[in-house]
């Protein structure tokens, strides 16, 4: 009762009210910027972060209670752009943030951040193959499929199968041509948020993921995780047919084709088919006359592709 909830300053010349959250209100508890999920300790960092997140300027002229962002579906109005976007996605079913681990999609950055904790490797469900621990049973079952090769989700268009529904959903966009993730720098569009994120780094040159062993930096979490296995010698993906082990699920899949005879990569020039993408690229040079850079092909380097 009688508590000062909002500090307001009247601009008599323009007849508008300038608002700012008061210091004593922010000190009551650890503040949270809900538009992006980032937590800030202290009112100063919260104010700075909120302005960076929303684009608002300190003491910006704005009519008190103004809500310029109106939902086209239910006409609900919002004063904050991130809240407005998240609300509209609730109507459209849009979930623009994809988890790289399991393919599950989320409506906001804060939601996917919370979800990623589930993949942290600290949980009660331990994988018998590689020892990784998962937070919940559903994630454990999805993870286990990377070892067993089980792919229960099949594309109705081409019959290609996937280990989880999120991957199938992204794959189906290759048939529909849907590319909902657009780069703000160059306008290039992508099938998934993961591809967009990897592309954006080509503009910035940023490599945020660093190897704890040698300090080498990478553009994606999956890349640094694969690289770290070169230090540990870990090869958690084992072929059921011959027992050969690999550092990544993709290498196991490629190897598996030597047993099944599957050759999904076809030369555009002559139609010859291959078991892996690198083999078809090498073959295509016989048509183009292109020669690989000699500096990358010194004696004793490289690996023969079977």
UniProtKB/Swiss-Prot annotation:
One of its GO terms (biological process) is regulation of transcription by RNA polymerase II. Residues 287-306 are annotated as: Disordered. Keywords: DNA-binding, Metal-binding, Nucleus, Phosphoprotein, Repeat, Transcription, Transcription regulation, Zinc, Zinc-finger. The keyword Transmembrane helix does not apply. The keyword Transcription regulation applies. It comes from Homo sapiens (Human). This is Zinc finger protein 625. The gene is ZNF625. Pfam families: zf-C2H2, zf-C2H2_6. Coiled coil: none annotated. It comes from the Eukaryota. Belongs to the krueppel C2H2-type zinc-finger protein family. One of its GO terms (molecular function) is RNA polymerase II transcription regulatory region sequence-specific DNA binding. May be involved in transcriptional regulation. The modification Phosphotyrosine is found at residue 209. A zinc finger (C2H2-type) spans 31-53, 69-91, 97-119, 125-147, 153-175, 181-203, 209-231, 237-259, 265-287. Gene3D superfamilies: Classic Zinc Finger. It is found in: Nucleus. GO terms for cellular component: nucleus.
